[in-house]
Design a protein with these regions (language model features):
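Conserved SxxK-family serine transpeptidase/carboxypeptidase catalytic domain
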Residues: 221-263
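Active-site-proximal loop/helix segment associated with metal-binding centers of metalloenzymes
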Residues: 284
Length: 321
C-alpha cells in the first residue's frame, strides 16, 4: 500500500513537472518577440542557420528545434510584436521578403558592387567578380529591382543581365540597327553622352552630334574618353599633351567608338541615343556661363569661337588643369 502511494506520488510529480515544462514552452512560444512596430531578421544562407538563430533569437530557435522544422535563409520583416511560434513558422515555410534594390549608374563595376553590397547578403568583392570586368558594363541596366536579400552574387549578376536583355525589346534593337550600331555600341555611346552632359534635355542633341561624326568617319574627339583613358575624372582642363595618351579609349587618336562603355549609363541616356535628334551639328563646347550646357556648331570656325570663349573663362577662373 505504501509502495503504491509512493508510485502515485512520483507520477504526480512527473506530471506536474511535465505540465510546468509544457507551460513554460507555451509561454515562450506565445510570448511576443520584439517591441518595435517593424523589425527584421536576416538569416544568412551560409554557415549554420540554427546556430545563428540560437545566438541571436533563442526563443525562435527553440520553437524550430522543438518542431523539427527546416530553416529558410532570407530577410523576414514586418514582424512587430508577433509570438515566437508565428515567426518560427514564417521562417520554416520560407515566407521571406523581397527587398528593393536600386542599381545606380556608376563609372565602374567595382562602384556598382560597392553600392549594392550593403543592401544584400553578398559582399562587394563577390558581386564585382560575378558581374565581370568593366567590358561587361553594357550588360547592366540601372533601375530599381525587387530581389531576395539572400541572393548570391552569381544570382544577382544573372538577374541584372536578364533585366538588361529584357529591356532591349525588339523595337529598341531595331532602332539600334537603324543607326548602324549594336546594342553594346549604343550603350557605349550613351556612356559618353552622359559623361558629356548632365543636362538630360540636351542629351539627344549630343547623341545626334556624335552620330553625325560617326557617319562622316570623323574622330569623335570626346573629352570624357580622354579622362577615362588617363584614369582621372577630376581634370577640368584637358591639354594637347593629354590627347597623345596611348589608349584604345582615346577618341582623339582612334576612329569610331571606344571598345566599351566608359561608365554604366542611365537608361534615359541609352534612350537618348536611340532617339537622337537629327541635325547638322558636328562640334560642341561647354558654355562659359556655368550652366552645364553646350554651344553647338555646324562649322569648325564657329566651334573655334565657342571654344575660345570657354577657354577665356577658364583663364579668368585660373583653371589650368
Amino acid at each position: 500500500m505504501k509502495r503504491s502511494s509512493q508510485i502515485g506520488l512520483t507520477l504526480v510529480v512527473v506530471i506536474v513537472a511535465a505540465a510546468g515544462y509544457a507551460a513554460s514552452k507555451y509561454t515562450t512560444w506565445t510570448q511576443a518577440v520584439g517591441s518595435e512596430a517593424n523589425w527584421c531578421i536576416e538569416i544568412p544562407p551560409s554557415g549554420n542557420a540554427r546556430d545563428y538563430l540560437a545566438q541571436h533569437h533563442p526563443e525562435i530557435a527553440a520553437v524550430i528545434d522543438w518542431r523539427g522544422w527546416s530553416i529558410y535563409p532570407g530577410k523576414y520583416c514586418e514582424i512587430g510584436e508577433q509570438p515566437a511560434h508565428a515567426i518560427a513558422r514564417r521562417i520554416a515555410t520560407g515566407q521571406r521578403e523581397e527587398i528593393t534594390l536600386p542599381v545606380p549608374s556608376k563609372r565602374s563595376v567595382a562602384e556598382i558592387a560597392k553600392a549594392l553590397a550593403p543592401r544584400i547578403w553578398a559582399d562587394s568583392a563577390s558581386i564585382a567578380a560575378a558581374l565581370g570586368t568593366d567590358n561587361m558594363k553594357w550588360q547592366i541596366a540601372p533601375n530599381t529591382y525587387r530581389i531576395y536579400w539572400e541572393s548570391s552574387a552569381d544570382q544577382l549578376a544573372e538577374r541584372l543581365r536578364a533585366e538588361s536583355q529584357a529591356w532591349w525589346t525588339a523595337e529598341r534593337i531595331k532602332r539600334a540597327w537603324a543607326l548602324g550600331l549594336s546594342q553594346r555600341e549604343v550603350v557605349t555611346l550613351a556612356s559618353i553622352v552622359q559623361e558629356e552632359t548632365a543636362n538630360a534635355a540636351e542629351a539627344p542633341t549630343v547623341a545626334g552630334l556624335y552620330l553625325n561624326r560617326l557617319k562622316k568617319k570623323m574622330l569623335l574627339q570626346a573629352d570624357p574618353t580622354l579622362k577615362y583613358a588617363l584614369g582621372d575624372w577630376s581634370i577640368q582642363r584637358l591639354l594637347d599633351e593629354d590627347k597623345k595618351v596611348d589608349s584604345p579609349y582615346n577618341t582623339y587618336r582612334n576612329p569610331g567608338l571606344p571598345p566599351g562603355p566608359i561608365r554604366i549609363p542611365e537608361l534615359a541616356y541609352v534612350e537618348a541615343v536611340l532617339n537622337a535628334d537629327q541635325h547638322n551639328y558636328l562640334y560642341m563646347c561647354a558654355k562659359p556661363d556655368g550652366s552645364g550646357t553646350h554651344a553647338f556648331a555646324r562649322t569648325y570656325n564657329q566651334h573655334v569661337r565657342n571654344a575660345r570663349a570657354y577657354q577665356n573663362m577658364l583663364n579668368r577662373e585660373r583653371i589650368y588643369r
